[in-house]
Regions:
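Short, structured surface patches at the beginning of a domain
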Residues: 1-124
């Protein structure tokens, strides 16, 4: 079965070079093609990474809820959110829908979990 993916790209500010979004997208397209993934959606937005309350994240969640994707591809996990607790909550919500997060730079989520446990925080 071919993995269906949503490519997610984000820039923090509109005054950043617009081509950076295209560069992120193109790198993710190549990454997906090399692995034989089927790109179902490309989501690109400009906004702060401090919160998950963004249209692109809602679009991604909708695709997951409708079982249209198997994974979300990002160039770096920080493109999703800069807050590790919120990133783990997003990962949990996606996982319940059978959707994983795949980063071109590797997966720091286990380190995020260890940090949260060390701080005595529980993610529901």
């Amino acid at each position: 079965k071919t993995m269906r993916v949503a490519v997610y790209c984000r820039l923090a500010r509109a005054d950043q070079n617009d081509t950076l979004l295209e560069v992120q997208k193109e790198r993710l397209r190549v990454y997906a093609k090399e692995r034989g993934y089927d790109i179902v959606a490309e989501i690109a937005e400009i906004g702060s990474g401090l919160s998950l309350n963004r249209p692109g994240i809602r679009e991604m969640a909708g695709l997951a809820h409708r079982h249209m994707i198997d994974a979300v591809l990002v160039s770096d996990i920080s493109r999703l959110c800069r807050d590790c607790g919120q990133t783990l909550r997003l990962e949990g919500k996606l996982k319940k829908q059978g959707v994983s997060i795949e980063s071109m730079k590797g997966n720091p989520l286990p380190e995020y979990r260890r940090a949260r446990i060390a701080l005595g925080c529980i993610i529901k």
